[in-house]
């Protein structure tokens, strides 16, 4: 009945979120490999880019410390950056947490130096 339909819709929506998260992480990885001045990662480096309004999309692991997450989201909102929460339910999401400290950003423009 209706309950099953709602449950199925939730599963589909969760799947769509994962697809979107995966696409964002793939985009980040491609930029990192091919045009690394368009991305940055790590808490301090991302903070610097947020401070000058250079962040287009902020990627945050859902496993980040909540206070840190709140601070970064607030800074992103002040500059109009998009914020995407990325779960560790798939390889690229786990990699965000493991390799980049759970914090990365796709920039609005190429930075002069990486970081």
Regions found by a protein language model. Name each.
Residues 1-115:
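Terminal alpha-helical anchor/extension segments at protein ends
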């Amino acid at each position: 009945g209706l309950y099953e339909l709602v449950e199925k819709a939730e599963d589909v929506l969760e799947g769509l979120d994962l697809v979107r998260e995966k696409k964002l992480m793939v985009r980040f990885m491609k930029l990192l490999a091919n045009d690394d001045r368009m991305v940055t990662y790590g808490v301090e480096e991302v903070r610097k880019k947020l401070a000058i309004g250079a962040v287009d999309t902020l990627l945050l692991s859902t496993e980040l410390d909540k206070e840190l997450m709140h601070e970064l989201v607030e800074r992103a909102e002040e500059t109009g950056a998009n914020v995407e929460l990325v779960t560790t339910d798939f390889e690229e999401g786990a990699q965000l947490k493991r390799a980049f400290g759970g914090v990365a950003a796709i920039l609005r423009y190429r930075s002069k130096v990486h970081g």
